[in-house]
Curated annotation (Swiss-Prot):
Keywords: Disulfide bond, Glycoprotein, Hydrolase, NAD, Secreted, Signal. It comes from Neurospora crassa (strain ATCC 24698 / 74-OR23-1A / CBS 708.71 / DSM 1257 / FGSC 987). Residues 20-137 are annotated as: Thump. Its main location: secreted. Residues 141-231 form the TNT domain. Conidial surface nicotinamide adenine dinucleotide glycohydrolase that cleave NAD(+) and NADP(+) but not their reduced counterparts, NADH and NADPH. Lacks both ADP-ribosyl cyclase and base exchange activity and does not mediate synthesis of calcium messengers cADPR or NAADP. Its function is correlated with aerial hyphae formation and conidiogenesis, but its physiological role is still obscure. Is able to ADP-ribosylate itself for self-inactivation. One of its GO terms (molecular function) is NADP+ nucleosidase activity. It catalyses: NAD(+) + H2O = ADP-D-ribose + nicotinamide + H(+); NADP(+) + H2O = ADP-D-ribose 2'-phosphate + nicotinamide + H(+). Belongs to the fungal surface NADase family. Residues 1-19 form the signal peptide. Glycans are attached at residues 38, 62, 112, 139. Both aliphatic amines and carboxylic acids are able to inhibit non-competitively the catalytic activity. The inhibition depends on the non-polar moiety of the substances. Dioxane also acts as an inhibitor of NADase activity. Auto-ADP-ribosylation acts as a mechanism of self-inactivation by its substrate. It is an enzyme of class 3 (hydrolase). This is Conidial surface nicotinamide adenine dinucleotide glycohydrolase.
């Protein structure tokens, strides 16, 4: 497998954080789908409102779960997204979870109904590629004191610079399904001991533009914690002290 590291990517890989808003003026409620159109979505928007019976066509609609998940289908993510809840509010700002599609059309495009029975994840582990199809990535050492995060369990092996916008991560909406302990499935970590990762820009996928930075680890997050490389942190540590 070939890897390409362009000079422009070098600067990208050295980024270890994305600035959070310093005021409460960022958009809060994401309960209505946005008309935001990005590089991997079409220029159309779903013609139905969430109140329309047609909105949930093509989903595993479950009315008993409709207050928890969109259309009562856990694949589509939670109904309620952060509103005035730092640091997650700005991370999810302008996020259009279905990339302009109706829920059923989104599942038809991105979910493998007949094969794996799960999401069709991007090739090359989600890294962007050059014009010849080579992965744009390089080994990078995360230094002590760096903050990273992820939307997902500790058994995964991908991290991102802390507070990077969700739309830059090219993740499916189900990654936002959390619980009382970890709202919206959000986990923050600090680097305790330096360790190497494969770092590079993220390809557009799941109707999202991507182009953030991802760190693919050589052990899963749970192992990195157990071995003393990462420490779980309260997400509130990302909120500016004078906020």
């Amino acid at each position: 497998m070939k890897f390409t590291l362009l000079s422009t990517a070098v600067a990208l890989l050295t980024s270890t954080a994305v600035a959070l808003p310093t005021s409460s003026s960022s958009a809060g409620s994401l309960l209505n789908e946005r008309s935001y159109v990005n590089a991997s979505s079409t220029a159309t928007t779903c013609p139905y409102s969430r109140r329309s019976p047609a909105y949930c066509a093509g989903t595993a609609q479950n009315r008993t779960l409709s207050a928890t998940y969109i259309c009562g289908d856990s694949r589509l993510g939670p109904v309620v997204l952060p509103q005035f809840f730092l640091p997650l509010d700005p991370i999810l700002d302008i996020y259009d979870r279905f990339g302009g599609l109706c829920p059923g059309a989104f599942l038809e495009k991105w979910f493998n109904q007949t094969g794996s029975g799960w999401w069709d994840y991007p090739p090359q582990n989600g890294f962007s590629v050059d014009d010849e199809g080579n992965i744009i990535a390089a080994n990078l050492t995360l230094q002590t004191g760096t903050f990273v995060d992820r939307f997902g369990s500790e058994y995964g092996s991908f991290l991102a610079p802390a507070a990077a916008p969700y739309l830059q991560r090219s993740l499916p909406p189900s990654n936002l399904n959390g619980d009382a302990k970890f709202p919206w499935n959000y986990h923050v970590y600090s680097v305790i001991k330096p360790f190497a990762v494969l770092a590079g820009p993220i390809a557009p996928w799941f109707g999202q533009p991507g182009q953030g930075v991802q760190y693919q680890t050589y052990e899963n997050v749970a192992t990195l914690i157990a071995d003393g490389y990462l420490k779980a942190e309260d997400p509130q540590r990302l909120v500016p002290r004078n906020y």
